[in-house]
Amino acid sequence: MKPHGFDLNRVIFTQSAYYLITGVWPLLHMDSFERITGPKTDKWLVKTVGVLVAAIGGSLMVAARGHTVSREAQLLAAASAAGLSVIDVTYVAKGRIAPVYLLDAISEIALLAATAKLKP
């Protein structure tokens, strides 16, 4: 089933681009990243997460561009979106990260919902 004309390749490609951009951003310009998301104590950890998110994005992009989104790639996309959204909501609620992270949570939940509805 393709809700609203979406197919899994498009959804995964969108997620991959989002992950590449948001993952690389703190690596390229930490100052602007912190202006939007708030100051960070452990910049090395922000960069580590950025590298991992970008790596997931790159892997998903290869799958989407090759029109070969496997169940494994779909699971990686869904699990990543679920995990990141839970972290966002949990730590905003605890006051550890800025409320702007709820925008990321909304994006992640939308990606998760779209990915879960589509079949490879």
Regions found by a protein language model. Name each.
Residues 1-120:
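Short amphipathic, positively biased membrane-proximal segments
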